[in-house]
């Protein structure tokens, strides 16, 4: 304790007994012990407070690092997502346009009574029948198919 050995402590106690006397010595020892306990408690409190402050500072630094990292990641994701969304938007617009073109082709085919072949060539019903006639079917079957197609087309017009 304080760099003092047993012999040195014994010398201090003997001097204290001689100097204070046997009546005041016990009270002086109690006061000295209370003083050292108070000093020890104060030092421990200061140490704990300092440790907490250091820990809080470390946590603050760590939090700021994570915040900066998070902000950097968010910024990089914003750029990527916007580019991807623009690409998706362009693709969707192109698909919508192609669907609208197909719808217009079908609308024109219904109005002009032609069959679209999706190769941007329109084939009339008569040409289609001529192609069918050249196949193995008999003319009677072709005529029945034409009559059925006409009836179905009329029904579709009624629904529209």
UniProtKB/Swiss-Prot annotation:
Residues 118-160 are annotated as: Disordered. The keyword Cell membrane applies. GO terms for biological process: protein transport by the Tat complex. The keyword Transmembrane helix applies. It comes from the Bacteria. Residues 128-140, 149-160 have a biased composition (Basic and acidic residues). It is found in: Cell inner membrane. InterPro entries: TatB. The chain crosses the membrane at residues 1-21. Keywords: Cell inner membrane, Cell membrane, Membrane, Protein transport, Translocation, Transmembrane, Transmembrane helix, Transport. It is a single-pass membrane protein. One of its GO terms (molecular function) is protein transmembrane transporter activity. One of its GO terms (cellular component) is TAT protein transport complex. Part of the twin-arginine translocation (Tat) system that transports large folded proteins containing a characteristic twin-arginine motif in their signal peptide across membranes. Together with TatC, TatB is part of a receptor directly interacting with Tat signal peptides. TatB may form an oligomeric binding site that transiently accommodates folded Tat precursor proteins before their translocation. The Tat system comprises two distinct complexes: a TatABC complex, containing multiple copies of TatA, TatB and TatC subunits, and a separate TatA complex, containing only TatA subunits. Substrates initially bind to the TatABC complex, which probably triggers association of the separate TatA complex to form the active translocon. Belongs to the TatB family. This is Sec-independent protein translocase protein TatB. It comes from Helicobacter pylori (strain HPAG1).
């Amino acid at each position: 304790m304080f760099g003092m050995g047993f012999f040195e402590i014994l010398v201090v106690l003997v001097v204290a007994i001689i100097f204070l006397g046997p009546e005041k010595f016990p009270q002086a020892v109690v006061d000295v012990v209370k003083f050292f306990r108070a000093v020890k408690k104060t030092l421990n409190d200061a140490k704990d407070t300092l440790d907490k402050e250091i820990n809080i500072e470390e946590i603050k630094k760590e939090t700021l690092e994570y915040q900066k990292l998070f902000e950097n990641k968010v910024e990089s994701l914003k750029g990527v997502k916007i580019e991807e969304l623009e690409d998706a938007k362009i693709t969707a617009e192109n698909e919508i346009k192609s669907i609208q073109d197909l719808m217009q082709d079908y609308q024109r085919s219904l109005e002009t009574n032609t069959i679209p072949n999706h190769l941007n060539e329109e084939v009339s019903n008569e040409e289609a029948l001529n192609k069918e006639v050249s196949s193995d079917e008999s003319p009677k079957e072709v005529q029945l198919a034409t009559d059925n197609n006409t009836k179905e087309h009329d029904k579709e017009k009624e629904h529209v």
